[in-house]
Amino acid sequence: MHRNRIELQNAYERIMNSRSALDEFGEIVIENDGHWNPSEVADPTKLIQLQLFNITASGIGAESALRNWMEKAVTKLRE
C-alpha cells in the first residue's frame, strides 16, 4: 500500500474514532507541518478550506468543511 494512502487511512480512522473530530483533524494537520488556527475554525459563519493528504475541502464553518473532507477521503480510499 502506498505511504500516502496509509497515512490517509490512519488519519480517517483517528478522526472517526475521536471524541472531537475537528480537534483531531487539527492535531493531524499540525503533525504534518500544516497550519491550524483554533480561533479561525471556531467561527461557524466563516468559509473554511481544509487541505490534508492532497484532499481539499471547504464549507461554511469548519464542521461543514470537515464533513466534506471526510466524504472526499472515503472516495479516495475506495479508488
Feature locations, PLM:
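Short, compact, well-ordered microdomains
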Residues: 51-79
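N-terminal segment of the canonical double-stranded RNA-binding domain
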Residues: 1-49, 56, 75-76
